[in-house]
């Protein structure tokens, strides 16, 4: 997105006790701390952490990252474990927990699922505010005795995924996972609410073919791309096979078999 179309935001402390934390976030994100009557979004700092609120009468409510309670906790406890389609897509099997690079981390939901299954997950998020929400959520998760071991398997990097993958230093991830932004067809209230935040801030991933190319060059074993079930494949090489669910599809680009150990 260009600066001319970027939405206006300001940072707001929800209590006097959070004023200093709000000041630090405003400085880090380069956003004004004072109230802005023309702001479209408020970055709010409260006792329960960081959240973003779309302002105006039709606001869907705040969006935050919470790995301890809510949807993530429910999926961790009742989501089907290694039988979930995402687990099959990345190659989770008995004795096999691949190292995963989630190159389009967003709010970290899929990365958290993989980490909860025992995978070491590196998350990359290019939009600084979304990355801040994710950082805040991981920090709070690290203080919870039940979730801290999962959060410890998640490492967050900020920046452009394609650039980071091209300049990767060290052991390559076995699996690169991509979930590019697209016009969502998911009708759930949660996804609608998050899309109203994401789309103005992030826009669609028009660089998905470049992401796929960089992922295929880096991953040692496979690349997995999550798509809407009826969406075309990303421009470039064709996937080896796909796993299809009710609303989503996982296109798998295998390079070599994952082994135990």
From Swiss-Prot:
Q: Where primarily located?
A: cytoplasm
What EC number(s) are associated with this protein in UniProt? 2.1.1.242
A Pfam family in this protein?
Answer: SAM_MT
Q: Which CDD domains match?
A: AdoMet_MTases
Identify the residues that bind S-adenosyl-L-methionine. Answer: 109-110, 125-126, 179
Q: Which Gene3D superfamilies does this one have?
A: Vaccinia Virus protein VP39
Sorted alphabetically, which keywords does the UniProt record give?
A: Cytoplasm, Methyltransferase, rRNA processing, S-adenosyl-L-methionine, Transferase
Task: Return the InterPro entries for the record.
Answer: 16SrRNA_methylTrfase_J, SAM-dependent_MTases_sf
Is rRNA processing a UniProt keyword of this protein?
yes
What is this enzyme's class at the first EC digit?
Answer: transferase
Record field: catalytic activity: guanosine(1516) in 16S rRNA + S-adenosyl-L-methionine = N(2)-methylguanosine(1516) in 16S rRNA + S-adenosyl-L-homocysteine + H(+)
Keyword RNA-binding assigned to the entry: answer is no
Question: Can you supply one Gene Ontology CC term for this chain's record?
Answer: cytoplasm
| Compartments it resides in | Cytoplasm
The molecular function terms of the Gene Ontology recorded here are: rRNA (guanine-N2-)-methyltransferase activity
Q: Which family does it belong to?
A: Belongs to the methyltransferase superfamily. RsmJ family.
Name the PANTHER family on file: RIBOSOMAL RNA SMALL SUBUNIT METHYLTRANSFERASE J
Q: What does this protein do?
A: Specifically methylates the guanosine in position 1516 of 16S rRNA.
Protein known as: Ribosomal RNA small subunit methyltransferase J
Its gene is rsmJ
């Amino acid at each position: 997105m260009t600066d001319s179309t970027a939405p206006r935001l300001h940072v707001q402390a929800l209590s006097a006790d959070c004023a200093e934390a709000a000041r630090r976030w405003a400085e880090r994100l380069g956003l004004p701390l004072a109230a802005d009557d023309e702001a479209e979004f408020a970055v709010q700092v409260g006792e329960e952490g960081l959240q973003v609120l779309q302002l105006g009468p039709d606001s869907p409510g705040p969006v935050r990252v919470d790995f301890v309670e809510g949807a993530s906790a429910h999926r961790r406890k009742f989501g089907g474990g290694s039988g979930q389609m995402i687990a099959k897509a990345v190659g989770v099997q008995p004795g096999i927990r691949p190292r995963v690079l989630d190159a389009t981390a967003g709010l970290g939901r899929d990365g958290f699922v993989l980490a909860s299954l025992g995978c070491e997950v590196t998350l990359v998020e290019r939009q600084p505010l979304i990355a801040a929400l994710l950082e805040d959520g991981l920090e709070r998760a690290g203080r919870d005795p039940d979730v801290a071991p999962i959060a410890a398997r998640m490492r967050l990097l900020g920046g452009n995924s394609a650039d980071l993958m091209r300049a990767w230093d060290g052991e390559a991830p076995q699996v690169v996972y991509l979930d590019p932004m697209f016009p969502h067809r998911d009708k759930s209230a949660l996804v609608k609410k998050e899309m109203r935040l994401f789309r103005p801030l992030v826009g669609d991933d028009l660089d998905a073919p470049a992401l796929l190319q960089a992922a295929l060059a880096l991953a040692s074993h496979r690349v997995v791309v999550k798509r809407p079930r009826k969406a075309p494949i990303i421009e470039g090489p064709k996937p080896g096979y796909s796993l299809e669910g009710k609303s989503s599809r996982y296109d798998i680009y295998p390079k070599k078999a994952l082994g135990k150990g």
